[in-house]
């Protein structure tokens, strides 16, 4: 019952926020101001996304990530960055027609006009670090969904030009550039 009260409280707070946000957005649009949001590729382990859709993430039966996200050593950090976000089960997400990703993007686009994709390079390939590692030096690159996700997204959103802006930090390979250029992000 305490959880139910907490859930109800957050539902009311979110309802009020979104109602107020819509008024802000309408005021911006009336002045021809577009709003840009931010969408990180990975979600937090303790997020509602992971809680509600555990099967879409690389977790063991008790819900602990089997591998986590980060980036290898680079000019920002000699030991890389160990973010700790669970990796996706891209195979299951693909089988669903990328439904979860489509819904995620639709949700953010209900709130903003354009979206900066944080760690865009992860859609081409992302750094996967074994559970328990203390640095990101021990990871490996794993293939992401690439162009297929963005093609499906274009169809689902009914647009020729996706309203996304790709972040280009980190290890940007020719394949990442080709993906970004192909979709003009």
Set out the residue ranges of the language-model regions.
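Alpha-amylase-like alpha-glycosidases and glucanotransferases acting on alpha-linked glucans and related
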Residues: 1-18, 42-185
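Conserved, well-ordered alpha-helix/loop/beta-strand core segments that scaffold catalytic motifs
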Residues: 15-42
């Amino acid at each position: 019952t305490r959880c139910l009260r907490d859930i109800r409280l957050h539902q009311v707070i979110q309802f009020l926020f979104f109602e107020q946000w819509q008024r802000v957005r309408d005021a911006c649009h009336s002045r021809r101001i577009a709003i840009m949001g931010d969408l990180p590729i990975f979600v937090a382990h303790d997020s509602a996304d992971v809680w509600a859709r555990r099967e879409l993430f690389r977790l063991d039966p008790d819900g602990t990530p089997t591998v986590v996200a980060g980036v290898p050593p680079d000019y920002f950090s000699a030991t890389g960055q160990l973010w700790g976000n669970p990796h996706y089960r891209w195979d299951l997400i693909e089988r669903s027609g990328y439904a979860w990703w489509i819904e995620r993007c639709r949700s953010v686009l209900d709130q903003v006009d354009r979206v900066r994709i944080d760690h865009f390079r992860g859609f081409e390939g992302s750094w996967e670090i074994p559970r328990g590692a203390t640095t990101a030096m021990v990871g490996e690159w794993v293939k992401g969904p690439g162009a297929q996700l963005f093609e499906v997204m274009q169809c689902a959103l009914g647009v020729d030009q996706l309203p996304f802006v790709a972040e280009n930090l980190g290890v940007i390979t020719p394949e990442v550039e080709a993906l970004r250029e192909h979709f003009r992000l």
